[in-house]
């Protein structure tokens, strides 16, 4: 469990082991951590083992800790990722994800017939946002190649997404996906414009390399982190140090208050 070190040590000492690292095998984790492609590329026999030692790796195990997911979400977390784990454990180490992906699509009609409430193969919709020349520039990305995306700004008209677009002021971006003519994921993001948006941040104390967020402009990029998931890529962290920064507004500027947000989660030492 957790990592591969215990299994490697067991095999090297002549004991049998079943591998189940968190990096690929914990299905209670979200798709942002472990999606279908990540599971498919898992190799249960560590490269550090000799041919003789590798005989002690009996297989792998995937985990679904239901206390981390309401009962109604269990199906969507297990399927379709369990198809990838099955493929990994009964196939050779050679990988062809495109071929596997095409075969996964053939399983969905049967899962529908069985009443399985399966989930997504990867995070359905993601974005990159860059603030430049006094505007936000937004690119949307679909998690599956056979998806179609629509978006709207500030609850306006839905339109097909084909190319990146701009937004000049504080904006609520919504997007939705479709696959095989069925809804396939929703996305919402606030683009927040203020006097510090896009301004340079000078870090007197550097942020931790494990919690980089979006980089040197994380604090002024106009994007807020999720209130539910500190792993969403928008949080920047400092470990064992204070936080001290200088934000250069570029000119003398009058302001009346400063707002910031923090994430607290004791179970992850945050």
Features from the language model and the residues they span:
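Disordered, acidic Ser/Thr/Pro-rich linker "stalks" and the adjacent N-terminal cap
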Residues: 187-255, 263-269
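Short, exposed coil/turn segments at beta-strand boundaries within extracellular/luminal domains
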Residues: 180-187
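Substrate-binding groove of N-acetylhexosamine-processing glycoside hydrolases
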Residues: 1-149, 155, 190-208
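Solvent-exposed segments in extracellular or luminal domains encompassing
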Residues: 163-172
